[in-house]
């Protein structure tokens, strides 16, 4: 337990919370070419610079699809491509949101399916909103 005198000399430090998706916090001032930190945004637009696969951490085994994305604020991040199959390639314009992938180190963002160049997952019936899939239209009735 510190004495009052010790606390006067060196006060207690505030515990700072680590930001989970830092790239969403910055915006680029194009005229000055400077990054400014603000309130942040829920999504950011970016261009894929590389689309590849990555293997997960120890107990799991798979080839997870990821993309390296250069954001509109100039930062480059690694984002996960959710769902089965995708149409993304280099120079595809995508929208990213925060959200890490637990078994992929360094992947802190998800690509939003069904927006910009990222198509929704084909033939998906349940949990469609997370994968950008439109509702399948009802089978038309036969005419007599």
Curated annotation (Swiss-Prot):
Residues recorded as bearing 3-methylthioaspartic acid in the entry: 103
GO cellular component: small ribosomal subunit
Region (Disordered): 121-144
Keyword field: Methylation, Ribonucleoprotein, Ribosomal protein, RNA-binding, rRNA-binding, tRNA-binding
CDD domains tied to this protein: Ribosomal_S12
Gene3D superfamilies documented for this protein: Nucleic acid-binding proteins (2.40.50.140)
GO biological process, one term: translation
GO molecular function annotation: rRNA binding; structural constituent of ribosome; tRNA binding
Listed PANTHER family: 30S RIBOSOMAL PROTEIN S12 FAMILY MEMBER
Reported function: With S4 and S5 plays an important role in translational accuracy.
Family statement: Belongs to the universal ribosomal protein uS12 family.
Quaternary data: Part of the 30S ribosomal subunit. Contacts proteins S8 and S17. May interact with IF1 in the 30S initiation complex.
Protein name: Small ribosomal subunit protein uS12
Source species: Roseiflexus castenholzii (strain DSM 13941 / HLO8)
